[in-house]
Amino acid sequence: MKCKGIVAIGPGDPRLIDVDVPDPGPHEVQVKMAATLVSAGTERAWVNGIPNATPAYPYIPGYCCAGEVVKTGSEVVGFEPGDRVATFAVDVGHREIGNVRDLEVVHIPEGVSYEHAAFTSLGQTSLQGVRKCKIELGESVASLGLGIVGILAMQFTHLAGAQPAIALD
């Protein structure tokens, strides 16, 4: 099977082309994407070929996405066709259909849109940073940079009890 996908052929050369979609492997979930998200810093570095930040060309950018399970591999437990899922998986995001390891997929709760669920991986990244800092009630925190990860991190530091929480961009 084939689907449309954005493929970075080389630095500064992304193209919308047909890409192959193999059957999912034993521990993979095949997802039909409903929403993908551009993580500006990471994807700009990848597409522009920034040293030490770029996968080998060609590659499919995008790792923040949400959609519906189409098929599951033979060893997958807990997911079935029709499930709404969000995923954090490199080389899958900006394409119509992709295979994702079952450990990189989470169910989307009822009432959450695909567009909001696509932010799951960026929320996970910012929350991990806040947890590693082990913020305690009343500690002050400053965030340098207010991209989406910085904004989410500031929200999580506030919820963790940081005061004051200072945002600098």
What are these regions (language model features)?
Residues 115-169:
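Mid-domain Rossmann-like dinucleotide-binding core that forms the NAD(H)/NADP(H) cofactor-binding site
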Residues 67-69, 98, 124, 141:
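Generic structural motif
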Residues 89-102:
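A structural motif shared across PLP-dependent enzymes of the aminotransferase-like
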Residues 103-114:
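Glycine/charged-rich beta-loop-alpha catalytic/anionic-binding loops adjacent to active sites
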Residues 74, 110, 135:
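Short, conserved catalytic or interaction motifs in soluble domains
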Residues 2-4:
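Extreme N-terminal starter segment of soluble prokaryotic enzymes
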Residues 22-38, 46-92:
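Glycine-rich beta-strand-centered segment in the early N-terminal region that forms part
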